[in-house]
């Protein structure tokens, strides 16, 4: 794990905060100013003006948060110390963390694929076959939410998603025509996500450093979601090749996408009490600060290239949360909706049903076995 962390540090480097690698941010969002000239780009996505937010009882007014961005270097130092003596494995590896009535990892994976396709279409993506591996990538980015996968197992192919290894996905992205430097960026953001999510689950001392600090919590939370890597591939699906470590628009879109989701989850009543709740503490004040940050990210995107894609992606949480089964299952008491036959037909092509080489030892139980089993559908 320490080797992975050091590799990430070398790739990303520091952002505007010295000592922040690999949790790099190029832009200091506390200092963002409203663009001087508004463009018609504000018509893309869901635009809720800051002065109109109090009209909605599930929203309210805004307030600038105290800047805690510089504290990210302290978080890095904490993680460095933890990794010095961290065990190679944890007893909870491959534990299902969805909080729902899942029977096994294979079932979780099917539901993750359902959720992936749902997110993608809300972001504005197409289910065209040429996006197959981009969708598998998003699924890989979603699985650590619901299963505690060790990053090493993800990288070396011990863990497979519906029969697909990470190397399969890498080769597939290149075959779909995604430029190699964009594939590398997407790969490294996914490695970073796997590492930060795993550390968040196994290090009991990390969360206390983040709670009640809106900008610091946001910095870490966006890394665990990997919305930046997903945005890179969404743009690639539209033939738009952008994205490097200095791309402020990608940063702001990835931040706003997480914030729009949290705002909608709070409106739906499913944010409070989450293990990784972003507004735990003085919830009323922290929600005001979160909305302040969201508004400024969206205003920044108004003046950026490709706003027609990025603003929809950034604000999409406001409409996918109340519509997607993933979140409605939480309203239902964390009970899964059965997979209907029509859904199973959509999911079937994403399952690799050829035999998968087995491995000896404890890893053998964690290679996806669904490859030879039909999808169970609701009658």
UniProtKB/Swiss-Prot annotation:
* Effect of deleting the gene: Abolishes the production of humulene.
Q: Single GO molecular-function term?
A: alpha-humulene synthase activity
Q: In which pathway does it act?
A: Secondary metabolite biosynthesis; terpenoid biosynthesis
Known uses? Eupenifeldin is a bistropolone-humulene meroterpenoid first discovered as an antitumor and anti-leukemia agent. This metabolite also shows anthelmintic activity against the parasitic worm Hemonchus contortus, anti-malarial activity as well as antifungal activity.
Key words of the record: Lyase, Magnesium
Which EC number(s) does the record attach to this protein?
A: 4.2.3.104
Needed cofactors: Mg(2+)
GO biological process terms, alphabetically, are: terpenoid biosynthetic process
Coiled-coil segments: none
Q: What family classification does the UniProt entry report for this protein?
A: Belongs to the terpene synthase family. Alpha-humulene synthase eupE subfamily.
Q: What is this protein called?
A: Alpha-humulene synthase eupE
Tell me the organism.
Phoma sp
The gene name reads eupE
């Amino acid at each position: 794990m320490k080797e992975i962390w050091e590799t990430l540090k070398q790739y990303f480097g520091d952002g505007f905060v010295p000592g922040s690698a690999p949790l790099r941010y190029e832009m200091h969002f506390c200092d963002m100013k409203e663009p001087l000239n508004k463009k018609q780009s504000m018509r893309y996505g869901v635009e809720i003006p800051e002065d109109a937010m109090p009209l909605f009882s599930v929203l309210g007014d805004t307030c600038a948060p105290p800047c805690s961005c510089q504290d990210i270097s302290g978080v890095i130092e904490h993680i460095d110390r933890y990794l010095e003596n961290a065990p190679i494995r944890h007893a909870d590896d491959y534990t299902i963390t969805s909080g729902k009535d899942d029977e096994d990892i294979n079932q979780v994976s099917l539901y993750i694929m359902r959720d992936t396709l749902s997110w993608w279409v809300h972001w504005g993506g197409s289910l065209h076959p040429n996006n197959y591996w981009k969708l598998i990538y998003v699924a890989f980015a979603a699985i650590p939410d619901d299963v505690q996968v060790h990053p090493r197992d993800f990288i070396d192919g011990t863990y497979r998603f519906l029969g697909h290894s990470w190397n399969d996905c890498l080769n597939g992205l290149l075959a779909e025509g995604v430029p190699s430097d964009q594939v590398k960026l997407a790969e490294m953001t996914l490695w970073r996500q796997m590492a930060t999510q795993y550390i968040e689950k196994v290090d009991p001392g990390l969360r206390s450093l983040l709670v009640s600090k809106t900008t610091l919590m946001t910095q870490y939370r966006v890394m665990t979601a990997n919305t930046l890597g997903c945005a890179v591939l969404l743009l690639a699906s539209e033939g738009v090749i952008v994205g490097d470590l200095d791309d402020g628009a990608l940063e702001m879109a990835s931040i706003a996408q997480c914030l729009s989701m949290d705002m909608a989850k709070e409106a739906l009543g499913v944010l409070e009490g989450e293990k990784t709740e972003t507004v735990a503490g003085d919830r009323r004040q922290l929600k005001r600060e979160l909305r302040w940050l969201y508004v400024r990210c969206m205003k920044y995107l108004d003046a950026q290239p490709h706003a027609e894609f990025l603003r929809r992606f950034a604000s999409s949480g406001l409409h996918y949360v109340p519509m997607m089964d993933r979140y409605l299952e939480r309203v239902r008491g964390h009970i899964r909706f059965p997979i209907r036959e029509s859904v199973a037909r959509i999911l079937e092509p994403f399952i690799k049903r050829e035999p998968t080489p087995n491995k000896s030892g404890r890893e053998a139980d964690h290679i996806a076995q669904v490859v030879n089993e039909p999808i169970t559908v609701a009658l």
